[in-house]
């Protein structure tokens, strides 16, 4: 293929010819063969002159079939193609090139070779002889010599031959009948032996099969029982686990519920306490605010022009009452209101 072909990477080992193994004399095989009388360079087996060198392997890198290169090497360069119609074409080309005789000679040789060595159908004809010169009964040539003695001799010979032939045929028939009887007897015995053997084998096979089936049934039964036991134990374990899980869940739910109830009770209690505290506080604020209102009205009536110093209230709500008083004083004072609303006189 050249450069256009696929690249084939070849990797060879450190010892592709395996020379390390063949040169190593310390191995068991080498020592054993040397004890038996073998020496390096000799063949192994009956014939000592066998192959003593290593086999060389040719790596196949193309897609051609086995033996393609050998066929190409042995092919004659001047061999003509075997396509249909090429012979006539070659003759025409030879005539045009002025080599008609040479081409015709090659073509004729090729045709003769095909006829002689080609795989063609051959018809065999049975040879016959002249009926007038051959005696079929005697299987010999007929002699036409004249004479009475010869005729008598011939007749006697013919009669003797016929008698012998009859006797031979009778003997053959007797032998054949005896042989047939013997063969029939042997065949019968063989048949009986064969039938007995087959019956015995069938019986043994049947017994083996029954034993095997019994064994398989027993094993299946044992497996089934084991499986059922295992399933029962698994079911029991699963049920116990489920019951434990349910109990645990119920317990956890109960604990959660109790915790929730406690928490709700606590929250309710805290809310109630807060509400009570708030109510008490609001009540005290109202009382203090009422007292502050009364005092402020008194101070305004007594002296409207100057600011009156409030008397301190000896109570825990004195700070709030003071703030309320200041707020009320600013609201009641006209000058302060003008400053708040930015009204000029």
Swiss-Prot record:
Residues 289-312 have a biased composition (Polar residues). Its main location: nucleus. InterPro entries: G_patch_dom, H1/H5, PINX1. PROSITE patterns: G_PATCH (PS50174). Residues 25-71 form the G-patch domain. The keyword DNA damage does not apply. The keyword rRNA processing applies. Residues 187-227, 238-278 have a biased composition (Basic residues). Keywords: Nucleus, Ribosome biogenesis, rRNA processing. It comes from the Eukaryota. GO terms for biological process: box C/D sno(s)RNA 3'-end processing; negative regulation of telomere maintenance via telomerase; nucleosome assembly; rRNA processing. Residues 228-237, 279-288 have a biased composition (Basic and acidic residues). Residues 1-25, 166-317 are annotated as: Disordered. It is found in: Nucleus, Nucleolus. One of its GO terms (cellular component) is nucleolus. GO terms for molecular function: DNA binding; enzyme activator activity; structural constituent of chromatin; telomerase inhibitor activity. Belongs to the PINX1 family. Involved in rRNA-processing at A0, A1 and A2 sites and negatively regulates telomerase. This is Protein PXR1. It comes from Lodderomyces elongisporus (strain ATCC 11503 / CBS 2605 / JCM 1781 / NBRC 1676 / NRRL YB-4239).
